[in-house]
Curated annotation (Swiss-Prot):
PANTHER family: MERLIN/MOESIN/EZRIN/RADIXIN (PTHR23281). Residues 2-295 form the FERM domain. This is Moesin. GO terms for molecular function: actin binding; cell adhesion molecule binding. The gene is MSN.
């Protein structure tokens, strides 16, 4: 039995290992990969490997894996990557897995600066990336430093602004909070909808020359072929949609494109190596095929996939709504519990105050009772003294009578009697004054005792009221062999049909232009970052982008502009560059 060969395939977020037979074809390996990860939109993808000369190459599906120039390592190493890009991610990418693989690949391109992204857009995209990873911002979970382990911005952007890690996190967090309620899958799609408007998104650049020998860039993407000047890969100067191209071929390093317009000359350019022309041919054929397919009704398979995706999305939205409803109920219950706890604490505090007031009133009552008893004793003493004085007065009166009688009986002398009489009269007068004084004191003590009694009755009434106040019930708790240098020529006819005239891509607008929310966010970020920007660190791409913005250009306005005039005029313009 033939010995099996170990293969390792790395996707954007996983590492897969297989054992294949020596006669296994590229397609058989590819099919095994897509089946393993559950991918059905296979037409965008391919298997990439590094050949024996160190060049990155796409695996041919119709040839055996072992017959291709794969480095003889164990295991054999491949990368599963997007080879072709959609025109519009929201219309073409159906499965969540497809969207996620594109998201991760595009994000990697932006962070590595293979796709130029202006600072404000980079921060906004970072916030969508954070939403797709962490879900809704939660201050209880996402504490300061929660983004410390994530690479979210291109190094160029970090170096161009005088902001530290914490300040970058604060800015990204603000926009992360803005996406509350957005599903992680929707955040991925929003990221791609903005990223696809970047000028370098989905473009394969190849160094080339025209007949004059001018150094230019040829850009191959989902919409056609574009020509760029050597120092500007953001702004194409001439464009040819796939619908204008009839045949593409190469002979050694010479690449020839025949337009559908018979009056137009061939579009000829020269590549530095034969292998580059082979790659260009393969990319042109694949992109043209997808361009034409998009302009026809969906196949039954695609219709079924879209229907299934809609159903799955609807189900997720239902589940999300249910979760949100449960979350709101839980939050309301927690708030109600907090309210009850708060009211309970307030009642306990009120009860404590009442108890203190009651205790204070009880003490005052005891003090007033003590004072009342003391006054009552003082009153009794004064009354006793008054009675004693009254008795002495009576005795004096009796003595006076006795003296009068004695004077009559004993016939005392008038002088002696007068003297005794005067003494007794004086004594009677003194006793009367003393009696009146004591009666006055007794009346005064009686009045004070009466006042204390009234205060005592008032305090008893207040205490009774405080003790009868209700305290409340206790609250309840709640997818041509590039290495084959012998095959020096190849040709491919690009079929066209009635749908070829559909150039709807020229009518597109950017996500920022049609989405007011995105436009508002980008404007705010531009203003916010301006103060921290170090103008001395601007790159050539930054300056080109700024000039395009000043002139009101964007990807689609530029596309309309570079396709103006007939095919012949644009080919003549290319030859004169």
């Amino acid at each position: 039995m033939p010995k099996t060969i170990n293969v390792r395939v790395t996707t954007m977020d996983a590492e897969l290992e297989f054992a294949i037979q020596p006669n296994t074809t590229g397609k058989q390996l590819f099919d095994q990969v897509v089946k393993t990860i559950g991918l059905r939109e296979v037409w965008f993808f391919g298997l990439q490997y590094q050949d024996t000369k160190g060049f990155s190459t796409w695996l041919k599906l119709n040839k055996k894996v072992t017959a291709q120039d794969v480095r003889k390592e164990s295991p054999l190493l491949f990368k599963f990557r997007a080879k072709f890009y959609p025109e519009d991610v929201s219309e073409e990418l159906i499965q969540d897995i497809t969207q996620r693989l594109f998201f991760l690949q595009v994000k990697e391109g932006i962070l590595n600066d293979d796709i130029y992204c202006p600072p404000e857009t980079a921060v906004l995209l970072a916030s969508y990336a954070v939403q797709s990873k962490y879900g809704d911002f939660n201050k209880e979970v996402h504490k300061s430093g929660y983004l410390a382990g994530d690479k979210l911005l291109p190094q160029r952007v970090l170096e161009q602004h005088k902001l530290n890690k914490d300040q970058w996190e604060e800015r990204i967090q603000v926009w992360h909070e803005e996406h509350r309620g957005m599903l992680r899958e929707d955040a991925v799609l929003e990221y791609l909808k903005i990223a696809q408007d970047l000028e370098m998104y989905g473009v394969n650049y190849f160094s080339s020359k025209n007949k004059k020998g001018s150094e230019l860039w040829l850009g191959v993407d989902a919409l056609g072929l574009n020509i760029y000047e050597q120092n500007d890969r953001l702004t194409p100067k001439i464009g040819f949609p796939w619908s204008e191209i009839r045949n593409i071929s190469f002979n050694d390093k010479k690449f020839v494109i025949k337009p559908i317009d018979k009056k137009a000359p061939d579009f000829v350019f020269y590549a530095p190596r034969l292998r580059i022309n082979k790659r260009i041919l393969a990319l042109c054929m694949g992109n043209h095929e997808l361009y034409m397919r998009r302009r026809k009704p969906d196949t039954i398979e695609v219709q079924q996939m879209k229907a299934q995706a809609r159903e799955e999305k609807h189900q997720k939205q239902m589940e999300r709504a249910l979760l949100e409803n449960e979350k709101k109920k839980r939050e309301m219950a927690e708030k109600e519990k907090e309210k009850i706890e708060r009211e309970k604490e307030e009642l306990m505090e009120r009860l404590k105050q009442i108890e203190e007031q009651t205790k204070k009133a009880q003490q005052e009552l005891e003090e007033q009772t003590r004072r009342a008893l003391a006054l009552e004793q003082e009153r009794k003493r004064a009354q006793s003294e008054a009675e004693k004085l009254a008795k002495e007065r009576q005795e004096a009166e009796e003595a006076k009578e006795a003296l009068l009688k004695a004077s009559r009986d004993q016939k005392k002398t008038q002088e002696q009697l007068a003297l005794e009489m005067a003494e007794l009269t004086a004594r009677i007068s003194q006793l009367e004054m003393a009696r009146q004084k004591k009666e006055s004191e007794a009346a005064e003590w009686q009045q004070k005792a009466q006042m204390v009694q009234e205060d005592l009755e008032k305090t008893r009434a207040e205490l009774k009221t405080a003790m009868s106040t209700p305290h409340g019930a206790e609250p309840a708790e709640n997818d041509q062999d590039e290495q084959d240098e012998n095959g020096a020529e190849a040709s491919a006819d690009l079929r066209a049909d009635a749908m070829a005239k559909d150039r709807s891509e020229e009518e597109r607008t950017t996500e920022a232009e049609k989405n007011e929310r995105v436009q508002k966010h980008l404007k705010a970020l531009t203003s916010e970052l301006a103060n921290a920007r170090d103008e001395s660190k601007k790159t050539a791409n930054d300056m080109i982008h700024a000039e395009n913005m000043r002139l009101g250009r964007d990807k689609y306005k530029t596309l309309r502009q570079i396709r103006q005039g007939n095919t012949k005029q644009r080919i003549d313009e290319f030859e004169s560059m």
